Amino acid sequence: IEQKPLVYSYLVDESADEVVAGNASMALVYSGEAAYAESLSKDLDYSVPEEGSNMWIDSWLIAKTCKHQENAEKFLDFLCREDIAMKNFEYVYYATPNKAVYDKLDKETQENKTIFPDDETLNNCEIFRYLDEDSIALYNKLWKELKSK
């Protein structure tokens, strides 16, 4: 709570826009937003703290109870098509798991550590796990306290 007067705002998805606009000096952002912001301003740089950070994976799945499994599979096939996967990459700036798309990227993009972090960085990160109910309750209590002051 003592830091609150020093913080521009507590945001997630809008943070990169605020830095690009010059309203904030730094922000906690996802790597895709950082890569997008860097494309707008060469004065910006993305870094992962030496202590590490979290990793995330956006995933698609088909539920066992899906009533239109064939269409769901067609949709996933569509997303995996090279041309569509390339459009998705160009829009979101997140690393692509599609090797054909990666191979078509220019060398500078392939070597961009914001988009494609090296093994040393990834080995120092972890995937967040679901919290138990007590932890969620504590998190919500502390967040409400922070936002209300």
Per-segment meaning from a language model:
Residues 1-2, 40-66, 110-111:
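Periplasmic-binding protein-like
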Residues 7, 11, 51-54, 63-68, ...:
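Extracytoplasmic/periplasmic, Sec-exported soluble proteins
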Residues 63-123:
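Mature extracytoplasmic/periplasmic domains
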Residues 119-149:
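Conserved C-terminal helix/tail region of periplasmic/extracytoplasmic solute-binding proteins
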Residues 16, 20, 28, 73-80, ...:
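Non-transmembrane alpha-helical segments in soluble domains
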Residues 1-49:
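Ligand-binding pocket segment of bilobal, Venus flytrap-like solute-binding proteins
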